[in-house]
């Protein structure tokens, strides 16, 4: 059984007014089947994990990859994938937390693919370039969506602002104009992003920017879907005691 990922969860304790370690989350794989486990031990590297001492639970295939009834409706990514692309797949490290989105990450991928089909037919320089989705057939010869392929960019606006003191100052007026143009284009298509923040704006080496991450995007006047705003797995509410605590996952060290 292969350990795919592990992260430490730190909770903000309102009484202590500080972050404290809560648990380590582990994602494992055996063949095509994925599993998850949590442990109260603070594990810093995958080599420190004894999988025989943790309670391993399966992640249902239907929760990871959704069935596609009509594959012809979806643009398929190039095969093989270009070297300069970003492959977005379901995030499993937050699986089975308190939100519906955390229990059905495959639904978010399918929804974003549907939105991207609108965007690929209506391209804009300030909207990420979508290359298509990856469809694979399971053992029952049923097509499932496994991931989404996009052009890869250098860094997020969040990173660019954080590193600005070491780089050329950011032209904020140009940046804001690009974001505004991208959002106007979306709204012109009758779409609302619902999760615009500096981590969902990417930039290239020339500070040209694009808006990314459309799994929260919905038609205008539509209901919010499984995911919206910052409550997307980066912050996941849990209640290990009587008080509400926010969990912040940090990547464990590699080993």
Q: What feature does the model see in each segment?
A:
Residues 187-204:
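Catalytic-loop of the protein kinase fold
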Residues 175-176:
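Activation segment signature within eukaryotic-like protein kinase domains
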Residues 204-255:
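C-lobe/activation-segment region of protein kinase-like
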Residues 95, 105-106, 120, 128-171:
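Conserved structural core of kinase catalytic domains
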